[in-house]
Amino acid sequence: LQAVLYAGDYEQYAQLLRRYQGVFIVEKPSFWDNLSFMFSYQFNYMYLRYLLWNFVGRQDDIQGKISNNHGNWISGISFIDEWHTGYPQDHLPSDALNNRGRNTYFFLPLLLGLVGLFFQFSSNKRQWWVVFVLFLFTGLALKVYLNERPFEPRERDYALVGSFFTFAIWIGMGVYALYSLLEEKISFKGMAPAVVSLCLLVVPARMLAE
């Protein structure tokens, strides 16, 4: 049964249930079961995981099957990655460390995007709602519409590229927020442009290096 599920072949799974319907007792999921599945799998595993791939880091390019070994997000911060994956990241085998899909951004793009999100909300709520609705409808709302099953035959991160682009708007605003804050708080005129230049160098340079 597990092998059939992992293959993602719904027809074979349905045939298996029909063939052994006298053996398997399949209970109809309740409303709360469906709600739990939506949040834990469709929202968390099939959306938030992809978002964090792009702005925190990615474990490898092997399709995830809700396991600790493949397809998870990682940050490059050892104790966080150990907590998330369930095992230390210090002595990984070479095939894991050298996987072409392995990226670590240390939360930098995500944090910069969150700074931009809160900055836009505090400075112009009307514009914030426009960007937020776009982010919502190209992300979580799309997951509700697609109603994905377990397990898909391949990763579905490409369907969410609009949501990632929208979050990138907040990353740009995060840079401007830092500039505005430093310009207001620090009297030295060259400090704010220097810090902004550092942000522009560190975050994109880290992503390009990976």
Q: Where do the model's predicted regions map?
A:
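Lumenal/periplasmic acceptor-binding loop at the mouth of the active site in multi-pass
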Residues: L1-L112
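Transmembrane alpha-helical segments
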Residues: G190-E210
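Membrane-interface catalytic loops of GT-C/OST-like multi-pass glycosylation enzymes that act
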Residues: R102, Q127, V144-V161, E210
